[in-house]
From Swiss-Prot:
Organism: Torque teno sus virus 1 (isolate Sd-TTV31)
Protein name listed in UniProt: Uncharacterized ORF2 protein
Xref: InterPro entries: HEV_TT_vir_Orf2/Gyrovir_Vp2_N (IPR004118)
Family annotation (Pfam families): TT_ORF2-like
Amino acid sequence: MKEKDYWEEAWLTSCTSIHDHHCDCGSWRDHLWTLCALDDADLAAAADIIEREEADGGEDFGFVDGDPGDAGG
């Protein structure tokens, strides 16, 4: 295993462990995407849609007026 691969695996294990310890949602990926997208309005809106899909049965209604990054919002 290359050193880079080990670092990435250790980072992912750390992230999932911290999330699982502090949150009961079971969706560390959604939280990670949201954190990565905080400085980018379009990515934040996309992460919000992903989270809504998980919460309401997987229906994707697309961007809603007022979402970050939406032209009308």
